[in-house]
Amino acid sequence: ASYSSQKNPDYIQIAKGKSAKNFSDEDLKNIFNVAEKARLTLTNRVQLKTPDADLNNFGANLAVAADGIWESPTFLHGAIAWRMRLNAWRGAYTADALSWHDRAKEHFESYANSQVLKPDFAPVEMDTMRHLARHEEKMGTSVFASGYISRNPNDTTKPHHYDMNLVFFDQLFSHFKYTGDKEFLKKMWPTMVRHMDWEKRNFKRGDLYDAYAAIWASDALQYSGGKVTHTSAYNYRANREMAKLAKIIGENPQPYEQEADAILKAMKNELWIKNKGYFAEYKDALGNQIVHDKPGIWSIYHVSDAFILNEFEDYQNLQYINNHTPKIPITVKGADNKNYFTLATTNWQPYDWSINNVALAENLQTALAYWQAGRTEDAYQLWKGNLIESMYYGISPGNFEQLSHYDAFRGELYRDFADPIGVASRTLTEGLFGVYPNLLENKISIRPGFPKDWNSAELKLPDWDYQFKRTSKKTEYLFKSKYQNPVALEMQIPVNYSNIKSVKVNGKKVEWKIKPNSILQPIIQFETPKGKDFKIEINYLGEELINEQTDYVNYISESLQLNFDSKKKIKNIYDPQGLIKNSPPPEGWIRPKGEDGVVNHKFELNPQERKGTFFLQVEQNGTTWWQPVNVDIHFPLETKWANKKLQIQSKSSNPINGKLNINGLNKTFTIQKNQSTSIEIPINYLSKGTNSIELEYNGIKQNIEITDWEIENQGEFNNISLASKYNEKVTEIFNQKYLSPRLKVTTLQLPWQGIGNWCYPLITAQIDDIGLMNKRKNGKVDFLEIPFLIDKTDKNVAFVSQWDNYPDSIEIPLTGKGKKIYFLMAGSTNPMQSQIVNGKITVQYVDGSTSELELKNPTNWWPIEQDLFDDNFAFEIPDDKIPYRVKLKTGELYKGGTLSKYSSIKGFTDRQIDGGAATILDLPIDPNKELKSIKLTAVSNDVIIGMMSATVLK
């Protein structure tokens, strides 16, 4: 079709049903013109100009979306889907960020009128109708008492199962900074005090806080009374802000200061993983009090948003995302590849709603966290990629989606969802332009977050205009404040030159300094006099700084060689994670030896496979800053088992002479640098399944495993009778009540049947073992040519658990020797126990030594009721570790994840196995040692670990 412009447009009316009246062309023209004027007023509210053409409609687009989620008196949960009232999540941040302070105030006031005032205190009543998974949803109980904000404005009568208070009051604290409205602060103070008391009463655990559905991604998150990073961060910020606000209006700040200090200290002591440099997801309250060390991205960015950490810690904490969070490439046929990617929120399994998703708001707030940590390039790359994916590549042009097309289970969802609109607003003003108003003190902090290759940018809002221009030797910032009172600007500006000639504000030179802990590049700090119009000029001398490499791969036994620009002197080292050999304790700086304190560019690192970061203080022309060094430490030999041969690839820069040992076989090998070799291993030294091999070279011992289930076993089998240890029939795993130990506190936790979550507390899975049991002959059943003995019928599994229903460990006596033990296992796990050890099988020898198999979700410990998922992105399991499974109902053997048909449990899983499945695992053992026993141990909470059979390969 072709079109040509018409000088006189035709106006068309589209109406549902019969029109109430006939409109003339003039009427329609007037209606259209009024609407068009309103549209232009709205789109011109946020005027953005950048060198990136993809972004220049972002401001107008954002204004329209933000207007779409407003319906007086409050912001809504979504513009189209979920167009309903809820006092959170992050949608309302858009109001103050985009200068709609009247809307913000109306939103806060109407929900303040929804705060419950009585009773002051009420008992904890966990909901027995929902199998103790959550608190009773009833007014007048512990959660729904004084301080709780109800879901509808101007209405205190409706309980709702989320702690939306936390984010609601976080938005309110920001509102006071954005407006400086002390009268409104005084009015809201009692409301805020009630909230703080409510949080402590319900969720305080020691000096930290539990999380009771307190963030968008909270469906199926349940911490069982544990100590949680993201809510502790929210409460830290709340107490810090309450202390500051108390001083302004003459209230007592001391209780809030003390609480904030206690939270900070406890977070550092209990949740900060010092040798890894990031915060854990949570710490269990019960059992082994495990620190769960694979956090969701919300644990990382909420810490940044509360400004808890110093610059070094903040950099390290964000590095967790770089090192460990699944990244999914954003690619579109025909589009230039700009290495855009999006993040999954976790790498946890099995999937359930909001446990492991690809969500726009989550990605945008992670980008904001990078900006808050001064990691501008990382911030921009993540931000831009996700905006492009949502606004250009998705189902609706200009959309702010909830979930992305790249979400493995749900795909793209919703148009203009409030949560990402609120976060997107903050990323524009606080992130890219770096503007943080604090009008309570008549100050504005500005920390520009522009990419290094931008030479201009401009943003106009009702509150302020901001223009950035850069030439070869000068950077200029024009800032026009439209606030009522004059303001001072607190500037922190990253610079690309080591020599600064002058800093001027409105033509007058001002004092400035380099921020002491500048990371990645020097950052200059200064404060302007109070005013409304500011012209800031930074004039440079000398050469532009060369960007240094930050990411290095290092091979064990080889020095790490840095290739910094020769003009930079390395003055100091800070090694908080203990990566460098003989590194002093990381409390203080390390003063290096050497002429003029200059450090060698070569470092010897501790010989351990890991990722980590240390920092080097560099100096050029008298200007100092800190350069991060991110290392990925590997063994220099990479191995692959293919065609019954072990292929070894050397990454070393030196020749390697080594020795291979497996089950008494010793073979020598030589590999030239960056070459590969193949070693044939006689079949009689191998066994079906997992084989442990030791490679010894250059003073290194590297233990590797090869897995091959097609190898023919050599040797006889010895079936172990577990009859005296069986304590349950496997079909009964979800047919009982797991009631203790549980804390008597308000929390979200596993329902008493041992499956499900707080959103779906009544679900179960029918386990049926008839096929497996009928397949036995003389008590034995063969899988993979391995005989498994199940020599009892009424009970056929030995369960262990941290629940009181079963012992936490069981010991099975053994005699003789063997080279491998095969196990038929069945039990439960859930996403809150993902990426950690759930249980252990320990083989004990007569001489006191042991061999151990860790049962880890998702690598080898899979839930009885469903299969886990492997897509190489958000759901990643090493292919050779995916176990064989046995369908209990039919006795059919299959490779995990490969069934052609799965059934579903509504709201819980679409990967259910009809009747459930057991898992075949194996553990190589020392063939030269006398066996004493097998010990089965439950390590993590919630789970049931079961052994149905054990077979020794002699």
PLM feature segments, named:
Residues 630-634, 686-954:
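N-terminal/edge-of-domain interface segments
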Residues 84-116, 190-193, 197, 222, ...:
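Active-site core of glycosidic bond-cleaving carbohydrate-active enzymes
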Residues 479-483, 648-654:
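Asparagine-centered strand-capping/turn motif at beta-strand->loop junctions
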Residues 522-524, 599-601, 667, 675-681:
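Short strand-edge motifs at loop-to-beta-strand transitions and within beta-strands
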Residues 1-82, 117, 174-177, 182-184, ...:
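Acidic/polar, glycine-enriched structural segments that form the non-catalytic walls/loops
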Residues 137-158, 212-228, 403-411:
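Acidic/His metal-coordination segments adjacent to aromatic residues that form catalytic metal sites
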Residues 365-578, 609-611:
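Non-catalytic C-terminal accessory modules of carbohydrate-active enzymes
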